[in-house]
């Protein structure tokens, strides 16, 4: 095999190794819980993962710390709860 072929093979194996962990990641179990909408402190805008729609949705979070399915931003929600297949 030529040195160019070996470099190509090495590059493909490296790419595969880098992408494999991301593609098999599962979401956190808290992402399947309903949002806690009780009011305990100041109400702030937050996001929760809605499994039936497979997306993050904005809601009013009252600071009760009911479960882990509340995030300060849509980006954080998506990073934690979206599955990568």
From Swiss-Prot:
In which tissues does this protein get expressed?
Answer: Expressed by the venom gland.
Family annotation (SUPFAM superfamilies):
BPTI-like
**Which positions make up the signal peptide?**
1-24
Q: Where are the transmembrane segments?
A: none
Q: Name one GO molecular function term.
A: serine-type endopeptidase inhibitor activity
SMART domains found in the cross-reference section: KU
What keywords is this UniProt entry annotated with?
A: Disulfide bond, Neurotoxin, Presynaptic neurotoxin, Secreted, Signal, Toxin
Intrachain disulfide bonds: 31-81, 40-64, 56-77
Q: Which InterPro entries match?
A: Kunitz_BPTI, Kunitz_BPTI_sf, Prtase_inh_Kunz-CS, TFPI/VKTCI-like
Question: Where's it found, cell-wise?
Answer: Secreted
A cellular component term, taken from the record's GO annotations: extracellular space
Per the UniProt record, one Pfam family is Kunitz_BPTI
Q: Which domain of life does this protein belong to?
A: Eukaryota
Q: Which residues form the BPTI/Kunitz inhibitor domain?
A: 31-81
The keyword Repeat is annotated on this UniProt entry? no
Q: What's this chain's function? A: Beta-bungarotoxin is a presynaptic neurotoxin of the venom. The B chain is homologous to venom basic protease inhibitors but has no protease inhibitor activity and is non-toxic.
Q: What subunit structure does UniProt give? A: Heterodimer; disulfide-linked. The A chain has phospholipase A2 activity and the B chain shows homology with the basic protease inhibitors.
Record PANTHER family: BPTI_KUNITZ INHIBITOR DOMAIN-CONTAINING PROTEIN, KUNITZ-TYPE PROTEASE INHIBITOR-RELATED
Family affiliation: Belongs to the venom Kunitz-type family.
Protein known as: Kunitz-type serine protease inhibitor homolog beta-bungarotoxin B3 chain
- Organism per entry: Bungarus candidus
């Amino acid at each position: 095999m030529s040195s160019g072929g070996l470099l190509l093979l090495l590059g493909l194996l490296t790419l595969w190794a880098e992408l494999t962990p991301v593609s098999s990641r599962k979401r956190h179990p808290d992402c399947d819980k309903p949002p806690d909408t009780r009011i305990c402190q100041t109400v702030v805008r937050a996001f929760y993962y809605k499994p039936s729609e497979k997306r993050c949705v904005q809601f009013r979070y009252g600071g009760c710390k009911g479960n882990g399915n509340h995030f300060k931003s849509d980006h954080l929600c998506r990073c934690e709860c979206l599955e990568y297949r």
